[in-house]
Amino acid sequence: LWFNGVNAPWDKWNDFGGGFNFEFWQDHFQKLHNSGVNAARIWIICNGDVGMAISADGTFDGATTAHWEDLDNLFYLAEQYQIYIMATVQSFDNFKDQNQNYQAWRTLIQDSDKTDMFVDNYIVPLVQRYGKSDYFWSVDLCNEPDWIVENEECGKLDWLYLEQYYAKAAAAIHANSDVLVTVGMGMIKYNSDSQQGNKISDSELQTVLSGDKYDKSLAYVDFYSTHWYTWMQGMWGYPFSESPTD
């Protein structure tokens, strides 16, 4: 299978459980299909302010009924128009200090038990609900987590907390489905042994995972999906002219 994909993050910010528009996505998927596109990366959680049952103390009880119903429609359309979905389930936006629930998300990611609640009450139900669909091909555990670590407005959290979430979620997804796992890293410097370390390498994720709740051998990403922008060229080169060794 050859993917010819696009980034189609949202129609309306926080579509799922919020302002989901069936007609928009139907028209969009039809246009993609007619243009020879067969895959789309979609943010099914944009910043966690809509569709999520999260308390101020970071306790996570799951997604709303509306969120699941909107996703039911999305995956129905994906099958109708043969669009393979990469579902992004978190972003640095969750942690930005202008968002309603930013402190709750920061607490969740820094509290191991509450991270487990997010995995148990959202990640696992997600892959169990849609994992049998031929058109649910991957989960992107976070969009550009680099900014959570680097930016004051996102809390400048430690990589350890993020890595522990990725390790737990990846292990849970692999234990419950055949859906692939990735993290949409914002910069190659955090996805490279020769720069500032590969924060999502197999060894890194399996090292930070403790206890016996998760199978360590399942804590890995299936592929890398690092982002690239033109402003990066002077620092890290052009990806299509560099080798993996470079």
Regions found by a protein language model. Give the residues of each.
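Long, structured stretches of catalytic cores involved in phosphate-ester chemistry, encompassing
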Residues: 240-242
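Active-site mouth of glycoside hydrolases
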Residues: 1-235, 244-245
